[in-house]
Amino acid sequence: MLELLMSGGWLMIPIIACSIISLAVIAERFWSLNEKKITPEQLVPSIWKLHKAGQLDKAKINSLSGSSPLGRVLAAGVVNYSHGREIMKESIEEAGRQVAHELEKFLNVLGTIASITPLLGLLGTVIGMIKVFAAIMANGVGDPTVLAGGISQALITTAAGLTVAIPTMMFYRYFRGRIDGLVIKMESEALKMVEMMHGERE
């Protein structure tokens, strides 16, 4: 396997580096985008109970804000409850945008890797074919082994680039969809809390 990678030439180094970075980002995103960590169950009902009991003090709001991304969004609304429904919603939307931006962390890295690794493979193909034609000019086409190195590099780098790019793009799309779903759920929970606190929902 190592010999196969080595025969791809120096362009295998950035392709392998991209694959390692991609694997690290995918593992980190799987760990970070855990639905139970981001949108814990029963958070809105617990806020409602504290609100009805008059126990939503500054300490509990700070604790809520640090508990999860959803808690941070809801806390932004609770802090501005006394300023009316519209200000409360605006605060929630602002916090929601910040949280959504944080959830998208490293996704651009995956998108970039998915875009550049096929290009690196293509560059390897071009370099390999240049070597083939240079060998033909120097030695003719009588000895196939003279051409083997260039053809091998041309094929291996292309295959390696696509091998990294295809799963990376799949995970990029998967994480993008998961983030969209989490943002929609946070918006729904925040709206529910606003309506409950303003007496529009039980």
Which residues are covered by each model-predicted region?
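Residue-level signature of catalytic and energy-coupling elements of molecular machines
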Residues: 9, 23, 59, 74, ...
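Predominantly long cytosolic amphipathic alpha-helical stalk/bundle segments
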Residues: 37-123, 127-141, 173-202
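Pore-lining and gate-forming transmembrane alpha-helices of multi-pass membrane transport proteins
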Residues: 145, 149-172
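Membrane-interfacial hairpin junctions
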Residues: 3, 136-138, 143-148
